[in-house]
């Protein structure tokens, strides 16, 4: 992977920083694993905006990614690594020995031609998926399940990983990238290694239009609005808002705690930093 800084031949190119990966597949994706993806523009079935800053963007197909990795004991060959517009990580197309193909989140270091396998007795190798009880303590993992059989939910974005730091009884303890220490059932599965495309955070889109290509609309500051539109709005001249930061609906923001899931509080050994 190479980090390319564009020459400032125009204002729109001046701040562009690209991440170029020569190993990515340059052709079309695997058609049987594609689904139609329609855009909502951030509106619900009443036509009202439920999520701000969404609209436009390039048309996309959804890639059906296998988050369960439940095809046990059957070796698979990595056919190619592909770009996926729906996520920051790359995806890998696997061809199993019985002929079936599936997409998975591409682990770091896995290239076309590699052999991967999942199951209880899978070897300890990047890209293989095992139950947490069979993974050595200290291992770096990604794609971790929270409920056995539900599919990966933790550490799925570009460069993400977690570390298995302890095993006790029916649970293992994970250290997440946020600093949180969390208990997870040992029967849950995880994939060894970290997620690919860790250089994603180094890129710079360079101009507002590149955000619009991705379906992201502008964000207007509350202090630039009128009082009818935002709690921070109004005032003569420029103001600081006059109160602690809140959302357009008056809820505290910018650091205010929002977690309210008491049911799983006992699973968190240490809160995130």
Swiss-Prot record:
- The organism named in the record is Azotobacter vinelandii (strain DJ / ATCC BAA-1303)
Annotated SMART domains: Ribosomal_L2, Ribosomal_L2_C
Q: Does the keyword Ribosomal protein apply?
A: yes
Function of this protein?
A: One of the primary rRNA binding proteins. Required for association of the 30S and 50S subunits to form the 70S ribosome, for tRNA binding and peptide bond formation. It has been suggested to have peptidyltransferase activity; this is somewhat controversial. Makes several contacts with the 16S rRNA in the 70S ribosome.
Q: Read off the Pfam families from this record.
A: Ribosomal_L2, Ribosomal_L2_C
Q: List UniProt keywords, sorted A-Z.
A: Ribonucleoprotein, Ribosomal protein, RNA-binding, rRNA-binding
Could you state one GO biological process linked to this protein? cytoplasmic translation
Query: Family per UniProt?
Result: Belongs to the universal ribosomal protein uL2 family.
Identify this protein by name: Large ribosomal subunit protein uL2
């Amino acid at each position: 992977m190479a980090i390319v800084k564009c020459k400032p031949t125009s204002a729109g190119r001046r701040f562009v920083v690209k991440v170029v990966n020569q190993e990515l597949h340059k052709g079309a994706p695997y058609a049987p694993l594609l689904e139609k993806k329609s855009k909502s523009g951030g509106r619900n079935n009443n036509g009202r905006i439920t999520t701000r800053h969404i609209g436009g963007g390039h048309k996309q197909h959804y890639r059906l990614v296998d988050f369960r990795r439940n095809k046990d004991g059957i070796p698979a060959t990595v056919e190619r690594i592909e770009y996926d517009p729906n996520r920051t990580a790359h995806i890998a197309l696997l061809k199993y020995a019985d002929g079936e193909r599936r997409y998975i989140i591409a682990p770091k270091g896995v290239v076309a031609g590699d052999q991967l396998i999942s199951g209880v007795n899978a070897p300890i190798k990047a890209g293989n998926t095992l139950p947490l009880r069979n993974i050595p303590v200290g291992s770096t993992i990604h794609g971790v399940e929270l409920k056995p059989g539900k599919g990966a939910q933790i550490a799925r974005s570009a460069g993400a990983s977690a570390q298995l730091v302890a095993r006790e009884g029916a649970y293992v303890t994970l250290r997440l990238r946020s600093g949180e220490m969390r208990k997870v059932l040992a029967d849950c599965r995880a994939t060894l290694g970290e997620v690919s495309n860790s250089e994603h955070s180094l890129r710079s889109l360079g101009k507002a239009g590149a955000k619009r290509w991705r379906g992201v609309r502008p964000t207007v500051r509350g202090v630039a609005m009128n009082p009818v539109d935002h709690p921070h709005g109004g005032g003569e001249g420029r103001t600081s808002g006059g109160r602690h930061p809140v959302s357009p609906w008056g809820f505290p923001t910018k650091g205010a705690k929002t977690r309210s899931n008491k049911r799983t509080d006992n699973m968190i050994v240490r809160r995130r930093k």
